[in-house]
A protein has these predicted regions:
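Acidic metal-coordinating catalytic centers involved in nucleic-acid phosphodiester chemistry
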Residues: 1-13, 64-218
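Catalytic centers of nucleases
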Residues: 9-75, 79-80, 97
């Protein structure tokens, strides 16, 4: 039996497992497009928490981040790395790229799902240095990027523009999309989504109940 050694055993409240159950219930309607739902998929390391395969050949890999604290998910959380560990963004991109380049799927989605709120304030790193860097509020930044990418005129990375004060941060973001062409980077940005401020554990329990009640007319 294979084991994904980096796959978490679920947080104390089994948050990612409930999300998996929530999506698995979507297989009950006879006209659904979901082919399978896998928890902690052995073939992936970053997008392994919940993997959804669709009958159309599309696949969605979800990394779940649960917290009981009130801290938000920030731009810095995405790009932060250490000498021994790549950034969260690089991890998600690497797994997505593996899916994308395999040729096994008609389309590959990468999703970061969390009950944390999206950061709403700019921040600064390297304040003590000569070249401090302004990092954008993640919620504002990501919304703006997704709007630009959705425009049919956005055909390459250079089509995406950011505020001048964010340019260095944007370059840092793109640098985390390692060993890839600009075309692949753009495809990832189109396929990547950050879902912040999701339901907590109790909220997903209620969502599951509502789905079951609806399907079985309880």
């Amino acid at each position: 039996m294979y084991k994904n050694l980096s796959a978490g055993m679920g947080d104390p409240y089994w948050y990612e497992w409930l999300i998996g159950v929530y999506y698995a219930l979507g297989m009950l309607p006879p006209d659904n497009d979901i082919d399978y739902v896998t928890l902690q998929a052995i073939e992936f390391q970053g997008l392994d928490d919940v993997v959804i395969g669709y009958k159309s050949g599309e696949i969605s890999g979800i990394q779940v981040k649960h917290t009981r604290d009130s801290n938000s998910l920030t731009f810095y959380n995405l790009i932060y790395s250490t000498p021994s560990r790549i950034s969260l963004l690089a991890e998600l991109f690497t797994d997505w790229k593996k899916m994308y380049e395999s040729g096994l799927y008609s389309h590959c989605n990468a999703i970061l799902l969390t009950n944390r709120k999206g950061g709403i304030r700019n921040s600064t790193i390297g304040k003590a240095s000569k070249n401090p860097v302004t990092l954008p509020a993640l919620q504002t930044f990501w919304k703006d990027i997704k709007i630009q990418i959705a425009n049919e005129r956005c055909t390459n990375i250079d089509s995406i523009s950011v505020e001048g004060q964010w340019q260095t941060a944007w370059n840092m973001f793109l640098n985390e999309l390692v060993d890839s062409t600009d075309t692949t980077k753009l495809e990832f940005l189109k396929s990547f989504d950050i879902k912040t401020n999701q339901e907590d554990l109790d909220g997903y329990v209620e969502n599951i109940k509502r789905k079951l009640f609806g399907y079985f007319k309880m």
